[in-house]
């Protein structure tokens, strides 16, 4: 692949040695196990003050008998808390990636610990319902339900309801901005910022980046089609703005945004198009394309470019939260 960064080449070589089949060739359970093998590292954990996991009640009209919605809260240590006055710790609500089918609280534990440690914020990871067991709009409704609950319970955390941001990667980036849309549409909470890492924003497969990277071993067109087929309930769901936020009638009133894309990613063009639409709607937007990198690169901290992107996000969130990061 022309102009692929040497680090990305090394990553593909390493993943290739594991002989993991593409998601589209697996069952949902098999795809979940494969992602856990790749992302759950056995190295030393990033230290934070405390990690708690607890359930919240799903919305009464969800019609789902699967039980409560689990949240995992990463609390900063005393040094991190020292960045903020009492009762003013900011909150980052994080939605993991995985095509709405795979990924979980553990696959993205390292990234949540990183943001908590670097920012001194509370990071709340959302264990939303996954497809195909729970198709659209289950994940979208869970995304907003978690955000609303956090906004209503900030005193529980000693946090500030005025400094909440959302973030997510890939399908989680989709859910982060969908939660922001729902917060705008349904009366809050107000958000300071949204961080969208190579987000899926449109149920379409005809962009230049899809054509150029259709067979990319990190994320292919076939895999994205497989994800969407599992996620959507019916033929018209893909046009709903809570599934395809790029198709929202307007994006006015959304929080400022940082959109990260990767040069060798089928989702690059739709991420860029969404950043352009946000900016066109008057939303303060920063778009950074990491040319030569692959989808999901930020989840691999051994990559220098991943750490550059992480530092960019930390700086942007620090400014949004009223602190240098």
Predicted regions and their residues:
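A glycine/proline-hinged amphipathic helix-loop "lid/cap" segment
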Residues: 1-73, 322-325
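Short beta-strand element of the alpha/beta-hydrolase
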Residues: 87-98
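Short amphipathic alpha-helix adjacent to the substrate-entry channel of hydrolases
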Residues: 106-125
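Alpha/beta-hydrolase active-site loop
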Residues: 134-156, 313
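Gly/Ser-rich "nucleophile elbow"/oxyanion-hole loop immediately N-terminal to the catalytic nucleophile
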Residues: 151-166, 186
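Hydrolase active-site cap/lid region
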Residues: 181-236
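Short beta-strand/loop motif that positions the catalytic acidic residue
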Residues: 259-261
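Catalytic active-site module of serine/aspartate enzymes centered on a nucleophile-bearing elbow/loop
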Residues: 302-325
